[in-house]
Amino acid sequence: GIENVVVTSQDPHAFLKDFEGYFDCVILDAPCSGSGMTRKKEKMEDDWSWEKVEKLVPIQKDLIELAYKLVKKNGLISYSTCSYAKQEDEQIVCYLMENHEVELLNIPDDGSLKGIEGIGRRYIPGLYKGEGQYQCILKKLGDSIENDFQPIEYKRTIKGFDNFYAVKY
């Protein structure tokens, strides 16, 4: 497995103090209205609303800004949602592109559809295995703080996980 990956659902604002400009890549699966989950939810029409979209857009903008601050120069941001609403997808990416130096990277055609105005990819059930998704990959070009982070050469065992991967017969 990959040893230098952390998966968290903690408030990302907590990372800024110690890790601004630190990460090679931030994968942001943003909270969204879930409009791409139509096959999974029996009563999607009861769960989805424009009000929900409008409530989530400021959160998504805040999170993509944080992702931008956390990646180092030339680092990557993968932004995804399980929504089809352009307000939660392409418009969030455009917001970042209008406010920061980023490069929109091409995602190869893998059966998905190009996003609106060619921004990112849309994964549609029936055309792609899985639920509905949106994804975009951006490369940070500018506005990066200089840091003196050095790689740490040690193995740390988290209490309770020391035998997590041990094979037992």
Predicted regions and their residues:
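S-adenosylmethionine
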Residues: 1-169
